Amino acid sequence: MPASDSAEWELPRLRTSFIFQDDYKYLGDDGSVSQDLAEFFDVKFYPYSPPGAPPVFAATSKKHAVICRLTQTTDKDANPCEIIQLIRDDGNEANCASCWSKDPITDQPLLCIAGNEGNVKVYNVTEGKLYRTLVGHGGGINDLATSPANPYIIASASDDTTIRIWSLAPEHEKQPCVCILGGEGHSYDLLSVAFHDNGRYVLSAGHDQVINLWALPEFPNEHMEIPIVIYYPHFSSSEIHNNLVDCVAFYGDLILSRACHEDTIVLWRIEGFSSDDPIPGPLDAPTPTDMTKQTRSYFTPTVSPQSRPAMFTRLAQFHTPDCGVQFFMRFRMYHVPGKHPILAFANAKSKTFFWDLARFGEYARFMADLKEAQQSYNGRVVVVDQGQGISLAQAQQVHGPGVGVVMKPAWLVPKRVKKAPGAAGSGSGTAANGGHNNNNNNNNNNNNNNHETGSQRSFSATNNLSNSGRDKESASMVSASPDPDSPFGFSRETLQAWADMYDLSNPVGLIKAHRSLAIDGAFVGRQVGWSPEGEWCVVVGNGNRALIYQRWGKERGLGSGTPGA
């Protein structure tokens, strides 16, 4: 989307939430009810609905799967969430993982659910009945994933240290397990599994701090007497994290992962890996001949025993504070061609974080344009907010050929600082002109409408408010004054705040969230789900609570397409 399309830059805001009253209780050794452990552990949107259809998601607790439909409403007070099906697991299993598939004959939606019993139960959601059960793991299952390339192929990650690849295709009905990823891959319970978009690569991670990448063979379109067993991953490393890894995912050919106690989500790449290259076979995987090596990779061959080329590279770290000792906390990336990739994560202190990865490139472009204009026009530069609806050509015509015009993304909001007692008047506008402001005070006051209110001091959750609609605390807030030592005219506080959120030049720096939203009450986020078209984001967690966030709302009183939101 072009930078001028303000709606595409909008980040989600909380629309509503609900708590599902579960009847699951934990029985102590003496048979007494010791505590209520009701908790949603997983949420997944049905990915096979036709474009424009109301999205459907499943929130999975230990004994239930709650199937909900989300619809646009014209009233901000109307509940957009409707429960359309409720599935109860009456067995002994405490479930924690789910994924979607569909019936290969009827195309009816299927929901796969798994937990500590180690079986994958497949339910026909339309009928609310058990469709079939996949048996084979020797321990509990902690994660499920569906291949983006084939809705009938799913993967399960288990405490038995293996990943099983299952097929729901009719030809594999008698032997649904088509592949086992095990052997020397992992040594302890697995927590996360993810497919590449092409369906031929799988990531796995867990308690042993190891992240593995496996290349899958092509599976025959006929009955298989025994599953294919792959003993070695094509990439393996315990160097990315220093604690158990509870979430891993592909972002294109890049990888996102997080670990307990680290309070970060790491973006990194495997050197030499490209999904465009031929798929390596099982015999191509490197074997652990030297157990002292913490990383081995098929994609970075060692030329000589003395050479130690980098096998992976850290690219960025997204700051997720206040996770504490909690684990089993999952992020989710919304990544659809032609739309902004948005990363979402909820911590253990009732906050949800959002990062729009398209903003990094726009920020770099803006800072480069600003620097170039400063040099080319000897400091005579005017910064125009794109949210004002003025094009670059129009701005250049107004200011003339002797002034450099730089278009600033509307979501780059100058930081506001608390007004000192007795301090005067209004702050500066957004002109960067080497220490003096060519714009008049009326323009400054108009620009301040894009600044944050006092309740939004993270300056990543900005709304384009009028003066009459500001938070009460905003009366004591003014824009940070221009710094004469700054080459860009913005205050040091503003430039630092922008760098903290949008500067990717330091791969070990902590990138603050572009938007951080808090809710009342204690809440530990467990999983995030995105609707297929990106307009809804659902976060589930303890207390069987689901938070429903929305973008591009059409409801009266909610507004739409706020540039800085």
Curated annotation (Swiss-Prot):
Keyword DNA-binding appears in the UniProt entry: no
WD repeat residues: 89-133, 136-176, 185-224, 240-278, 519-559
Subcellular localization: Nucleus
Classification via InterPro entries: PcG_WD-repeat, PRC2_EED-like_ins, WD40/YVTN_repeat-like_dom_sf, WD40_repeat_dom_sf, WD40_rpt
Keyword Transcription regulation in annotation: yes
Pfam family, one: PRC2_EED_ins
Coiled coil: none
Keywords noted in UniProt: Chromatin regulator, Nucleus, Repeat, Repressor, Transcription, Transcription regulation, WD repeat
Region Disordered, residue ranges: 417-488
UniProt biased composition (Low complexity): 429-450
One of the record's GO cellular component terms: nucleus
Gene Ontology biological process terms from the UniProt entry: chromatin organization
Described function: Component of the of the Polycomb Repressive Complex 2 (PRC2), a histone H3 lysine methyltransferase responsible for generating mono-, di-, and tri-methylation on Lys27 (H3K27me1, H3K27me2 and H3K27me3). The tri-methylated form is known to be critical in gene repression, and its proper placement is essential in defining repression patterns during development. EED is not a catalytic subunit but is required for the complex regulation of histone H3 lysine methylation by EZH2.
Assembly description: Component of the polycomb repressive complex 2 (PRC2) that consists of four core subunits icluding EZH2, EED, SUZ12, and RBBP4, among which EZH2 is the catalytic subunit and which minimally requires EED and SUZ12 for catalysis.
PANTHER family for this protein: POLYCOMB PROTEIN
Similarity annotation: Belongs to the WD repeat ESC family.
Name of the featured protein: Polycomb protein EED
